[in-house]
């Protein structure tokens, strides 16, 4: 079986016009000058005219051991370059493995050479091929109805061929395009007219809301300051200077005052969220000066300062009420 396969390899070598195709099979499969000469011939058939390697580098006295080593090394580099071996494998050039392994490697190389030679077409050019392809496409376009007709049956019956539907006329498409262009032009003119009548202000709605918020916060701040003034002048002397029994009768009023304080604290506690939200919204606003707080931010800061005073006063008032309730018990 192996001998028959080797005969087929040598037959291919004769068809490829290798001058020593009739050499003994052993000399082609095992290390020696006959094998190296065959591999050299096959490799340069694969490399072609634009080879980065030169056959002159392989010339030398075949009987000298150093020259033979250089030749084997050079063939191993070419084999790696061609992808025949993954690395520079000297043993592969000399031949290793079983008889079948050696024959398989040689057969693969011969098949590569055969495929590359018979696939070459010296008369072929890409320009001519492109011209032929264009002619084919033109012929298909001219005979479209015939190609997709039922007589030809080039496609299965369940395949829907979109091209069988009538195509719109080019002049009709141009007319519709012109009409759409006019509509677009009219719309653009209307947009330009509106823009000329009303100046575009991206911060318009934002500015109005900010103004309303500022007014409400200013009103609240005024109320908070007035309340602190009343507390300092009227309530504080009672809670700090009068004895516990003298607070009799102040309890119901104090409870109402405490409820008002708690509601006030709940409102003021949301000022931080209000300030953060305003800071996020005001980023990029044309009315915001870099490095300077806005009017809303300043008012919120003032309200927070008032909250600090209210917290302190509330603690004193709560302690007084708790003390009075303890005396009653």
From Swiss-Prot:
Cellular location(s): Cytoplasm, Cytoskeleton, Spindle; Cytoplasm, Cytoskeleton, Phragmoplast
InterPro entries reported in the protein's UniProt record: Haus7-like (IPR029711), Plant_AUG7 (IPR010604)
Cellular component annotations (GO), alphabetically ordered: phragmoplast; spindle microtubule
First-listed, main subcellular location of the protein, grouped into a coarse class: cytoplasm
Any Gene Ontology biological process: cell division
Coiled coil: 169-197
Bilayer-spanning residue ranges: none
Keyword list, A-Z: Cell cycle, Cell division, Coiled coil, Cytoplasm, Cytoskeleton, Microtubule, Mitosis
GO molecular function, one term: microtubule minus-end binding
Subunit (UniProt): Part of the augmin complex composed of 8 subunits. The complex acts on microtubules and interacts with gamma-tubulin in spindles and the phragmoplast.
Job description of the protein: Contributes to the assembly of the acentrosomal spindle and phragmoplast microtubule arrays as part of the augmin complex. Regulates the association of gamma-tubulin with the spindle and phragmoplast microtubules.
Record-given protein name: AUGMIN subunit 7
């Amino acid at each position: 079986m192996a001998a028959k396969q080797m005969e087929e390899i040598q037959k291919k070598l004769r068809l490829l016009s290798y001058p020593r195709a009739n050499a003994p099979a052993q000399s082609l499969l095992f290390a020696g000058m006959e094998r190296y000469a065959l591999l050299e011939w096959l490799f340069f058939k694969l490399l072609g005219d634009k080879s980065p390697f030169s056959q002159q580098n392989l010339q030398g006295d075949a009987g000298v051991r150093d020259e033979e080593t250089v030749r084997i090394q050079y063939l191993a580099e070419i084999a790696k370059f061609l992808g025949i071996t993954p690395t520079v494998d000297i043993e592969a050039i000399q031949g290793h493995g079983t008889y079948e392994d050696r024959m398989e490697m040689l057969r693969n190389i011969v098949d590569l050479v055969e495929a590359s030679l018979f696939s070459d077409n010296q008369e072929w050019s890409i320009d001519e091929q492109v011209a032929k392809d264009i002619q084919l496409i033109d012929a298909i376009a001219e005979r479209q109805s015939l190609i997709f007709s039922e007589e030809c049956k080039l496609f299965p019956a369940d395949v829907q061929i979109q091209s069988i539907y009538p195509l719109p006329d080019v002049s009709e498409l141009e007319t519709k395009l012109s009409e759409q262009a006019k509509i677009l032009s009219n719309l653009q003119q209307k947009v330009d007219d509106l823009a000329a009548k009303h100046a575009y202000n991206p911060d318009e709605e934002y500015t109005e809301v900010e103004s309303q918020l500022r007014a409400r916060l200013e009103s609240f701040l005024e109320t908070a300051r007035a309340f602190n003034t009343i507390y300092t002048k009227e309530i504080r002397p009672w809670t700090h200077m009068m004895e516990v029994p003298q607070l009799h009768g102040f309890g119901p009023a104090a409870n109402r005052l405490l409820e008002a304080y708690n509601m006030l604290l709940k409102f003021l506690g949301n000022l931080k969220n209000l300030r953060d939200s305003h800071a996020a919204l005001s980023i990029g606003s044309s009315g915001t000066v870099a490095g300077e707080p806005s009017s809303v931010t300043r008012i919120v800061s003032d309200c927070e300062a008032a909250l600090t005073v209210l917290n302190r006063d509330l603690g004193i008032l709560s302690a007084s009420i708790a003390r009075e309730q303890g005396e009653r018990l």
